[in-house]
Amino acid sequence: MAVPKKRTSKSKKNMRKANWKNQAKLAAKKALSLGKSVETQRSHSFVHPRYEEEEEED
C-alpha cells in the first residue's frame, strides 16, 4: 500500500479545505438562484411548461 513520505502541512491542508468549501458554496448559490428563477417563472436556461398553460388544459 502506498504511504506518503512526509506529512502535509496545516496551511496546505487548510487551503485545500477552503477551496473545497468555496466550490460547494458557489454550487449552492447557483442552485438557489436557479430555483428562485424557476419559482418566479423568469428562467431562460431550460424549457418548462407555464402554470397558465397547465391550468387551461384541465
Swiss-Prot record:
SUPFAM superfamilies: Zn-binding ribosomal proteins (SSF57829). Residues 1-19 have a biased composition (Basic residues). This is Large ribosomal subunit protein bL32. One of its GO terms (cellular component) is large ribosomal subunit. InterPro entries: Ribosomal_bL32 (IPR002677), Ribosomal_bL32_plant/cyanobact (IPR044958), Ribosomal_zn-bd (IPR011332). One of its GO terms (molecular function) is structural constituent of ribosome. Residues 20-32 have a biased composition (Low complexity). It holds the Pfam family Ribosomal_L32p. It comes from Trichodesmium erythraeum (strain IMS101). Keywords: Ribonucleoprotein, Ribosomal protein.
